[in-house]
């Protein structure tokens, strides 16, 4: 099991929203696809994410540093202990290799967007909704009765 490609593209939001300090007319967002070699219905399982409607696209850092680090890693080093799925924490650790301590604001959106796409792929490979995968991983499998 391996990640075969990670693609990022910037798209304009094309929004006319504005307030007294900011407008979105030039705002862009990064859209990411994490493409795996796991096949479902004849197509590779892919995880998707976008960065935010309040942040500009951040693909330069993704393409220069974070995507190459993931794609050049030993594929087995990115898997969970069972070897049946990816481990988002291990992928995060690969992205953070050779990054200096601190300075997280510059990279947080780029890394976070890739990480969300990885989680989406993990849930699809597991054949479960992402909220269930997260509950199993971080809340002893307990789903909240309500969110708010």
Walk through the language-model features, giving the residues of each.
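Broad gene-expression machinery/nucleic-acid interaction feature
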Residues: 29-31, 113, 146-148
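Metal- or metallocofactor-binding catalytic centers and their adjacent structured scaffolds
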Residues: 39-126, 136
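Short, surface-exposed, charged/polar-biased interaction segments
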Residues: 24-27, 34, 70, 135, ...
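Proteins with a high burden of low-complexity, intrinsically disordered sequence enriched in S/T/G/P/A and R
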Residues: 12-22, 58, 100-102, 139-148
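Generic detector of short, locally flexible boundary/turn motifs and exposed helical patches
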Residues: 1, 8-13, 95-97, 110-116, ...
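Catalytic pocket of metal/acid-base enzymes, prominently hydrolases
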Residues: 122-148
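Structured beta-strand/loop patches that form or line metal/cofactor-binding pockets in enzymes
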Residues: 1-59, 65
């Amino acid at each position: 099991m391996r990640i075969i490609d990670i693609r990022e593209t910037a798209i304009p939001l094309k929004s006319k929203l504005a307030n007294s300090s900011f407008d979105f007319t030039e705002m862009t967002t990064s859209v990411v696809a994490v493409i795996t070699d796991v096949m479902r219905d004849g197509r590779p399982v892919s995880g998707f994410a976008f960065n935010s409607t309040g942040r500009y696209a951040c693909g330069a850092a993704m393409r220069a540093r974070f995507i190459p680090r993931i794609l050049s890693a030993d594929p087995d080093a990115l898997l969970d202990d069972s070897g049946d799925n990816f481990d988002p924490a291990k992928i995060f650790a690969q992205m953070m290799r050779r990054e200096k301590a601190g300075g997280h604001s510059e990279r947080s959106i780029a890394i976070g967007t890739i990480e969300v796409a990885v989680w989406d792929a993990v849930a699809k490979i597991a054949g479960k909704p992402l909220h269930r995968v997260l509950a199993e991983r971080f809340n002893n499998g307990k789903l909240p009765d309500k969110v708010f």
